[in-house]
Amino acid sequence: LAVDGRQRVYVATGGKGRVYRLEKDGSSPKTVFESAAANVTAISVDDRGELLVGTDSPGRLYRVPPDGRAFALLDGPYTQVQAIRPAGNGATWVLAVSPGGAAPSAAAPPAAAPATAPTPQVSTEVPIVAIGDSTTVTPATSGHATGTTSAPRGAVYRLDADGLVDTYWEATGELPFDITVAADGRILVAADNGVVYALEGDPVRMARIAQVPARQLTRIIPRGDRYLL
């Protein structure tokens, strides 16, 4: 679900990749986005009613102007667009993943992705952790140390206000499930094995800032100076 500045509600659906808009007056829902994708997996809307829509099978990102025609901004190697998070500087951060395994090669057809996100195993809170001496900071290209080099399982993309998309970070370790933009501009990533990463800088630096006793962290939600996982 997403709500625009006029308090209209946008509903993403599975089975058929559609987005419906519900007006405040209770009139019949209007289809504002329709595609051949299996599911709409992420949506974001600004105050003007412009939509960003993420899908799976295939994993694409679309822009839908108010009462306009959808066009694709991103058609990458991952099977699912998992999260869309606007930032205060006009940029938008997009998380794309391949839940079933490594991202396919450019020559391979898109792999099928699960229609629903995995069920989280724990609900807890962790404070914001500043990057410092107690935090493990590694180059973004190294990922999580596993003893072998693995193909990326997901990526964070940066969408500029003018529509340009570039790859900011690729996940070669834990599978990422969600992202959020911290007040200081860092991108926080909730991932497999109860791990939370922070991404900052350009070129990007990755810091492992927290770990909780959970198999998966499927959401990270800001609550003041803390986060609900």
Regions found by a protein language model. Name each.
Residues 3-6, 45-48, 86-90, 181-185, ...:
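Residue-level detector of Asp-centered blade-edge/turn motifs that repeat once per structural unit
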Residues 41-42, 82-83, 177-178, 219:
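Conserved beta-strand position repeated once per blade in WD40 beta-propeller domains
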